[in-house]
Amino acid sequence: MKKNFILNFATKNVKEKKLSFGVGITLWALIVFAYMIFVMNWGFASAGLNGKAGISGYLGHFFPNANEAPGTVVNQAVNWGITIGRGIGSVLVGWLIVKISHKYTVILSLFFMLFGIIAPYSPTYAGFIILRTIFAIGGTMQIILIQPVVSNYLNQRQKAVISQFSPFFYPIGTIITLIPFAGIIGQEAQKAFRDNWQIVFLVIGLLTLIPLIGYIILGTKFDLYPSNIEKRNKQEKLSLATFFKQKDTWYWTILYGSWLVAVVFPFTFSKPIFHRLIGDSDGTFNDKISVFLIFFLAGMFLGPFTIGLLSKYQLQRRKYISTIITLGVFFYVLATVVFVLKVGKNYEYAKSYTDGWTWLFLFLGLFMGICLWGIQGVMLNLPHEYKGSNPYRVGFQFGLIWGLGYTAFTIATIITSLVNTPPGIDLKKLELNNVDGYALGAYILIIIFSLVSSIGLALLKEPNPEYKKLLKIRSFSEIERIKK
């Protein structure tokens, strides 16, 4: 292992300690809490704190004159750049872990997240975006930094369980950002949130100090323990180039990029697309769509205990994952049909929840969430299940999976955004009495991109081909739990 001054400092007085479950869970909890803070900070920006230029929110703050606000394409380009930055940060995680150790990579990523504290007080919009990009790079790294902890401290059964709970923190954070803008707390409270957007971002940013201080005090240098270094020296030498040359890396990119589209695009695009599909330019059903998204995210809390249970058993994974993702996308299509043909046609019930069609719409969102969120734990556990898997390899692999997955996600975002709002097209001049063709085209793309994951799964190898196929099981007694 090549040394540098940071690694030299990190390796001083390293005393090997037992890799106990309690320590592992503590480190895991600190990192997933940091990830939830990132999701909250990031989500509030698009959930409602953005406001409108010349009126409220951070757009009203930076552009008090609405005529000076950046156009749609510029705003989209900014978002694309930030997402690409997150992808680059994800790819760099594996390299940083090798160069400065896991503990100091975590601390560095949390330091990046502290830029979220000062971003709201930037004197310019450009500064605000740059500071939030640095913050986002640090926040994105958290989901990858979980994996070496899980790989080192937990056995195979414990990994299967914890992989079910790790995904909880994205929907929890996102639900928190949606609640103030779902009509639950009233219009005055919504206005207060938007008017005090800097304080909201400041409070969330300050929460980052909890995992930062916690990890400085409690974080361990498990990857620098002599026994781990000895194991790593006996293993194949890995680099980013090694993984770039492997076909599996690109199959994982297809799978994770497509899955990200399936779970993030409904949150990003449902409101504008749903409104345009029914010709509603006033956002009359905005609150109801927010509640639909809350139901979708709430599916995360049921998914791991239903859909996600497969990780605990000796059953093949690939076809199961593909089927569940397809089913989740199917529920999204059904929910859209119900909204466009029934819920969105009934303006009398736009603000109430007493009609049956609304509840069907909401529960389809829940079923969609159970499938798409519930399957995440099964997917996250897959790299741990392949023969030859080790913490060193998993750290590199997850960095690339998320980094390249975010890149694929960004490409899908650019294409969908350009179809949804083509440059030079004035949406205000579209005929709202008819279905908006641009919005419909964007929606069809979302469905296609969400289903591409099946291609990645078909190309990947089954991690345990000796496991039984679920469809060939004839009784529960044939299903065996994974041994430690």
Curated annotation (Swiss-Prot):
The chain crosses the membrane at residues 19-39, 78-98, 111-131, 134-154, 165-185, 199-219, 249-269, 289-309, 321-341, 360-380, 398-418, 440-460. Disulfide bonds: none annotated. One of its GO terms (cellular component) is plasma membrane. It is a multi-pass membrane protein. It holds the Pfam family MFS_Mycoplasma. The keyword Transmembrane applies. NCBIfam families: MMSYN1_0881 (NF043062). This is Uncharacterized protein mhp246. It comes from Mesomycoplasma hyopneumoniae (strain 232).
